[in-house]
């Protein structure tokens, strides 16, 4: 299951076209002999023409996983949603900070706004310009992140997300979050 999640994270990072272009290269280059993680990494790096050492260092060879907490603040005057993302897992020489992409999805009265961010620090704030006040917010749209996420959702927001989120992973996550705080659906 861990290798599946690693591939899932890599697909999120590279995108479908590069990820799926790398798979045949890996299979053809390594046909009929044992393979290792560096063989997989080399095939994917050759396909995307990028250095993925940092990715494999944290997801394949590293210890642990990211634990993320976020807090939001709506600045009505600037029409900007500020999202502070904090990595809460233990960080030391053996457990470094993680680096990972995340999609923020915000629904307003008239639009759906998606913003791609790259989380790489212990705590950082991202500004998302919006046409109007946010009605719904989703951190990690699609549920790609291999880690845990906690946020400043109210019970009402979680209940709305559980019933009406745009994807099943969001609805499932909201139900689990409601269960964790003792809400019964």
Would you name each region that the model predicts?
Residues 1-5, 119-121, 144:
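Residue-level recognition of alpha-helix boundary/capping or hinge positions
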Residues 1-83:
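Amphipathic alpha-helical substructures
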Residues 35, 164-173:
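Generic helix N-cap/helix-start motif at coil->alpha-helix transitions
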Residues 52-53, 63-141:
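Beta-strand-rich binding/interaction modules
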Residues 141-152:
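Short acidic/polar inter-strand loop motif in beta-rich domains
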Residues 151-162, 184-185:
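Amphipathic alpha-helical scaffolding segments comprising HEAT/armadillo-like alpha-solenoid repeats
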Residues 162-163, 179:
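Ankyrin-repeat helical core positions
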Residues 169-183:
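Structural detector for internal amphipathic alpha-helices that build alpha-solenoid repeat scaffolds
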């Amino acid at each position: 299951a861990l290798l599946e999640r690693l591939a899932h994270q890599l697909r999120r990072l590279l995108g479908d076209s590069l990820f799926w272009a790398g798979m045949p290269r890996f299979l053809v280059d390594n046909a009929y002999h044992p393979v290792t993680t560096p063989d997989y990494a080399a095939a994917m790096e050759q396909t995307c023409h990028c250095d993925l050492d940092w990715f494999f260092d944290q997801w394949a060879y590293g210890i642990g996983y990211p634990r993320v907490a976020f807090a939001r603040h709506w600045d009505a005057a600037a029409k900007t949603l500020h999202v502070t993302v904090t990595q809460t897992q233990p960080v030391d020489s053996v457990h470094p900070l993680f680096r990972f992409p995340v999609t923020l999805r915000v629904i307003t009265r008239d639009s759906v706004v998606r913003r791609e961010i790259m989380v790489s620090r212990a705590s950082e704030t991202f500004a998302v310009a919006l046409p109007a006040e946010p009605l719904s917010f989703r951190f990690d749209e699609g549920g790609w992140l291999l880690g845990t996420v906690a946020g400043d959702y109210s019970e009402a927001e979680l209940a709305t997300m559980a019933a009406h989120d745009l994807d099943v992973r969001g609805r499932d996550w909201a139900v689990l979050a409601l269960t964790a705080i003792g809400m019964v659906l």
